[in-house]
């Protein structure tokens, strides 16, 4: 079904391009009967591009000499991205801007099958990146307490929809953080336009917390809030699910250096992440509400308490750094900050936990909204976060579900600048479109799909949204 929609879109865009090309060539022919065909004995020149800025699929005109009249003989590039050539008329060519070619674009042209002798435009082109928030599924304003599976037109998400993760096939996983039948684990398959129930919350384990896909085991794990439980889901075995529990270290493990939790059962555990300690040993880490950082391995499920994080007790979500597996990033909800744990250091080291963004130091601050440099940027109840690279600049960026501000923020770790990419700060609502028009209502979960799209769980509106970059 999805493939058919994609193909229809391509045919539709191709039809538009053909019509525009005919209009363009016709107008050029009427206004300038003396235009010439391409002459291989003469040089090809590109003097200017008009307009010299724009976004994805915008129309621009190249002006020059000896461009010919056959658009099929022209190949135009914005940096490394090839554009669609709609029409040509001797001294002009009509082009559609390609997707995400880079902020500052050098325009190059190859003509008549030549693959080496690129002709460059004397002007550059400024690409204006555009974020678009799109609806995926769910019923806006639903009052159902429980999840209703089905196709995208009938799916309803229950109360307390929460965090997201994606597997390599692009399937999205979501938890409902509540006990009983309201606390369901579900998956969302956009390729098949359907959602499916996996399991309910458990009386002993408590509310299902954040899902996390582990590349090592190739399974999805939903953390449970109580007693060290977690759900293990196998996407490659019909989503078979098993409820498992972490084990306290006995005398034998304690003799190896494992440390037990001293306050009874592990409680209020939110999310898992895989990372390496100072010795290069790989563990799965979790941070409890009271600030306790502990770790374990799936092979034996015996946990080891690392210590208490300097920032102390707070609702949190943790995520790893895809490029530095000694770092764990923590969004600290009530403190309105994001911190970084450096596992290459001892937990007693002053540099073990540092503030990445948000004001007020390790103690945090009262929630508010402010874009700008990290010295002034403010959040209000940050929830799930993720780290990735900007597809154009390759700068490391972090996306933050700024729940109470009803928006998604982007923090650039290279420039220390915070911007808003979806929703309008402090304005709840429901609206798709650009950052200036889109509205959210308590965005709480976020994940990155294999093809680079960002999915958002909007708990206030009871929908899944998708942030696309154009």
Predicted feature locations:
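Hydrophobic core register within WD40 beta-propeller blades
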Residues: 163-164, 209-211, 270-274, 316-320, ...
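Short loop/turn segments immediately following the C-termini of beta-strands
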Residues: 176-179, 223-227, 235, 277, ...
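Residue-level detector of Asp-centered blade-edge/turn motifs that repeat once per structural unit
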Residues: 166-169, 213-217, 275-280, 321-325, ...
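Blade-level signature of beta-propeller repeat domains, shared across WD40, Kelch, NHL, RCC1
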Residues: 441-470
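Gly/Pro-rich loop segments of beta-rich domains
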Residues: 62, 129-160, 191-209, 236-268, ...
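Conserved beta-propeller blade signature
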Residues: 171-174, 219-223, 281-287, 327-330, ...
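Sec-dependent bacterial lipoprotein signal peptides
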Residues: 1-27
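Ser/Thr/Pro-rich low-complexity tracts
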Residues: 28-135, 173, 186
